[in-house]
Amino acid sequence: MRILFLHPNSPDYLCASLFHGLREIYGTNCVDLPRFDCMYAPIKRGVLNKIRGHGFTLYGLLEDIPELEEERFFIWQKNIAAFDLYIIADIWNSWRMLDQLLEHVDTRKILIVDSGDTNRFFPWNNLKTSWRGIWRKRKLLKHCLGYAKREIPARWSEAVGPAMQLLPNSLYKSLLPEKILPISFGIPGSKISYITPAQKTQRFTTHIVDADIASVLHHNKHTESYAFTNEQDYYADIQKSMYGITTKRSGWDCLRHYEFAANGAVLCFQDLNKKPAMSAPHGLNESNSICYTNFTDLENKLNAIAEKDYEKLLQNSYRWIEQHTTAAVAQRLIASIHPTLPKD
């Protein structure tokens, strides 16, 4: 299968992880348009420092494929219709490319990826746009192969925003794409490091995103920025930690969950039980993570974990992250739409 991956060429963790997985699986049969500059090695430190999180984990990993330069050149005029699947990554910033693409290819070959942290679906997030404009954008999605999204709310009314709250419940779903597909972040398989409990020297990672817990553990840092500027130091700190504190921030899913698990820190996830079932991360439960509400609750739960129980938690955490490599996430997404791809 040949895939054309259309994107706005700006850092986005979901688009980056999906493209990394697709390129790992399909090689030269996955063409990025335009060239996804920050994904390729070598990448300069100044570029990484402009990316949220200093570009840890996902950026500057891929080997460039010079022959794809010829394929990209004049592609809209010469060979735009030569692919089996078209992925519009980051629909909020790429909808104009979708509009252009629909002039050339079958709608049923187009997969939409919504990488936004909001649980609103395109185009319902910005209702300052005229209703005519919103309706036109919504029609762009009609009959597309699928709409992949991380943050999927429990109630469809939340997907369209407060301006539409007066509609009957039965109409909400009609405002959304026909086929909604869950998707999550992923982590390159090469970033998984297998650490044993015996190698642990501290209970928690240095940087803690839960301000209340960080304030109790005075030696731990809570900031809105990152505690490390070097990926190697960041990973080393995780690897010597038994647990990593994580929470919902802009959205439920974030790369931190996967970085912690890949480096051997069992996730302690605040209010995980409140996460909508279809929202990422998927597959976390009491067998591979700790759900807590506050510091007292967390302390009580951790104190009740025996050494052998922690070892089992860690094993299950590794099983979970092995199912959420970039390649595994990409493979599941393709499998979910492959039977419905039109045959030429």
Language-model features and meaning:
Residues 307-341:
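A charged, aromatic-enriched C-terminal amphipathic alpha-helix characteristic of glycosyltransferases
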Residues 2-286, 327-332, 336, 340:
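Nucleotide-sugar donor-binding catalytic core of glycosyltransferases
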Residues 285-295, 304-307:
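Conserved acidic donor-binding segment of nucleotide-sugar-dependent glycosyltransferases
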